[in-house]
Amino acid sequence: MSRTILVICATHRDHRELPLLAESGIDFIFHDYASTSLEDLITERAAEAGLVADPLGEIERILELVGGREIAGVISSDDYPGSALAAAVAERLGVPAPDPEITLICQHKYLSRVMQENHVPDAVPPFALIDVANGVSSPLPFPIFLKPVKSFFSIGAEKISSEADLAIRLPRWKELDQFFLPLDRMLWRYAGVSIGTKRLIAEGVLNGRQVTVEGYAYGGTVSIMGVVDSIMFPATLAFARFDYPSALPKGVQARMVEVATTMMEGLGFDNGLFNIEMMYDRETGQISIIEINPRMASQFADLYEKVDGTNSYRVLLDIAQGREPSFIRRQGRYGFATSCVLRSFVDYRVEAVPSDEDIKRLATLYPDIRVELHARPGRNLSDELQDGQSYRYGIISLGGRDLADALQKFTACQNELGIVLRPLDSSPSEPLRAFDLRTQAQGASGTVEALVPSGVAARPSRAHRKGAEPGFSSQCPPRHDGVRFRTNGLKAPDHRRGA
């Protein structure tokens, strides 16, 4: 008997991975969000972006798409708004999925911090809301880390060193109501709380080694799949690559697993995947939560497959159909896997990229490789969605015996791809191929190499982005004492952390 899986806000990885894993008799319905891309609303393209589809209306449109078909499961690997829409649609269809309220609370960086303080207070930095509309000063001592309550690719997240610096940064967020509107609308519908669309979160600055702890919850039990190291380009917040398994000491990883398990069990998160970004300060031994994502980390799906033998999309499909997943360990073809980001810190014109046939030929040389291209010929790197600090133009994920073997393969693959980038201030086209492993980024056992294009200087761009017209606003006191939620007995602590 055929079974149908509904994929909400389908991504390019969904289209790539799911057909490879699908059992016979499984069909997919791929849903696309009926709106201007939300990402555009927090970039320089915001002024040209159209209106955002009402998320509550989108739920009804998705149900109309389904029609009378029987749905065996609902999934989404999309961060925003996909995971929240999927939880809401699954609830309506009566199939397993995380609770919509818990999903939304995790997605809202401020409300998530409130719940973290309830369950794992020792892993939470000082935090407070900032009212953008009134231009209030930071209630925390500088330096602070300023974040929107929701974002993509860390856009808008930056270290602020003074009141003067804060005053410069705040105006751009005053007119971005449309971006925050879907989350605020759904929070009111499913959690009975609204923080409004003109608030940012200030946090104490975290230092150390960044990792992602990923796991799943099924039948009320939380299981951890793995810990993935995040390696940054030196002196930046830009990811260079993601390494699995983590090189952190086993004892540190065990503490992180305990924090993640306590947090997700305390929330009552169930029937889904999650990933929690954490920071480990080697000097103090402190473990801190950066943020909780109530979804799978799709970029890591094939890393687990390479090392453990189980693609995390398989776990997602099993849970969505009400089946207990089986995540085996260290049964893959490789001892190590990495996902390397092709990134520049200056803008380039894209002259040429490899064809699909070129990538297929590369896969015959390096089995199990995954190549993603985010650059298009005839366009500048800055024309694509970027973080405002650098220019990502591709991802190469592969396995190896160890880190050195994987990086050697990566360098060879990058050269084989033959991506041609032209400097904007010159006419000759020069292939950007050779990667220099001179620079060092902090690693678990001292240092590990970070991949930096030869001759590319770190020169971040900071474009001021004009926002879209406001569409919805509601007021809520900028405090986190007494915040109450509609279900699950969730209540914020009766004190203000970091004030």
Which residue ranges define each predicted feature?
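Conserved ATP-binding module of the ATP-grasp superfamily
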Residues: 122-125, 163-207, 238-239, 262-266
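Glycine-rich phosphate-binding loop of ATP-grasp-fold ATP-dependent ligases
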Residues: 126-127, 144-175, 184, 210-212, ...
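A short glycine-rich, hydrophobically flanked beta-strand micro-motif that places a catalytic Asp/Glu
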Residues: 270-283, 328, 429-437, 448
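ATP-binding N-terminal substructure of ATP-dependent carboxylate-amine bond-forming enzymes
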Residues: 1-102, 131-134, 344, 376-391, ...
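Glycine-rich active-site loop/lid that clamps phosphate-bearing ligands
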Residues: 344-377
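Beta-strand scaffold of nucleotide-dependent catalytic cores
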Residues: 158, 168-171, 200-204, 210-231, ...
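A conserved helix-loop-beta module that forms one wall/lid of the active-site cleft
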Residues: 87, 91-156, 171, 175-190
